Each structure stands twice: as C-alpha cells, then as structure tokens.
Amino acid sequence: MRVKKGYKARRRRNRVLKLAKGFRGRRKNCYRRANQAVERALDYATRDRRQKRRDFRALWIVRINAAARQNGTTYSRLLAGLKKAGVAIDRKILADLALALPGDFAAVVKAAKA
C-alpha cells in the first residue's frame, strides 16, 4: 500500500505559505512560487542585517563630520583628538549628541582639540 506524505507535507507547505503572508499575486497562495519568494526574502534578510550595520555606521560618520565641521574641525581630526584625550565615546553616541545636543557635542569637540 502506498503511503502518502499526509500531514507532514501539508504542515511544511503551510509553514511556507504563512511566511509568504503579505506577498502580492500568486506568491502568497501558490506553494511553488511562495517557496521561491520566501527563500529569496530570507536570503535578503540575512544579507541586509549585515548591510544595515554598515549603513548606520556610514550615517553616523556623515552626521559627526557635518557637526564637527560646524565646530571648526573635521571627522578624522575629531576622532584622533578624542583617542589622544582618552575619551571613549562611540560613533553612535557622538552622532546622537551632534543631532540632539549640539552644545554638548561642542564641549566634546573642545575636549578633543585640547
């Protein structure tokens, strides 16, 4: 007697279709298309988790550089000065300071120049 895949296959397909929820067209309800779309989406998600870190670091550097230039220095001189002064503030905090508290950022720049 032939044994069918039964509930295991259905469970696997439903898992894929659940992941494809929100997709457009046949990608949301046709298993084969949904499976391809979900695989690609998961690949992109994995890749872009790393890319997101790079993008944010670049954004922080741009913001710090812009604020540093308003205070009469450059990004590279600012970071070199901070390292020399022994000030351990990471780029994320520096960018937040530059955006939200320009006065405090100016004090940090002053400490780096000294």
UniProtKB/Swiss-Prot annotation:
<dbReference type="GO" id="GO:0003735">
    <property type="term" value="F:structural constituent of ribosome"/>
</dbReference>
<keyword id="KW-0687">Ribonucleoprotein</keyword>
<dbReference type="Pfam" id="PF00453">
    <property type="entry name" value="Ribosomal_L20"/>
</dbReference>
<comment type="similarity">
    <text>Belongs to the bacterial ribosomal protein bL20 family.</text>
</comment>
<dbReference type="GO" id="GO:0019843">
    <property type="term" value="F:rRNA binding"/>
</dbReference>
<dbReference type="GO" id="GO:0005840">
    <property type="term" value="C:ribosome"/>
</dbReference>
<dbReference type="InterPro" id="IPR035566">
    <property type="entry name" value="Ribosomal_protein_bL20_C"/>
</dbReference>
<dbReference type="GO" id="GO:0006412">
    <property type="term" value="P:translation"/>
</dbReference>
<keyword id="KW-0694">RNA-binding</keyword>
<dbReference type="InterPro" id="IPR005813">
    <property type="entry name" value="Ribosomal_bL20"/>
</dbReference>
<comment type="function">
    <text>Binds directly to 23S ribosomal RNA and is necessary for the in vitro assembly process of the 50S ribosomal subunit. It is not involved in the protein synthesizing functions of that subunit.</text>
</comment>
<dbReference type="GO" id="GO:0000027">
    <property type="term" value="P:ribosomal large subunit assembly"/>
</dbReference>
<dbReference type="GO" id="GO:1990904">
    <property type="term" value="C:ribonucleoprotein complex"/>
</dbReference>
<keyword id="KW-0699">rRNA-binding</keyword>
<keyword id="KW-0689">Ribosomal protein</keyword>
<protein>
    <recommendedName>
        <fullName>Large ribosomal subunit protein bL20</fullName>
    </recommendedName>
</protein>
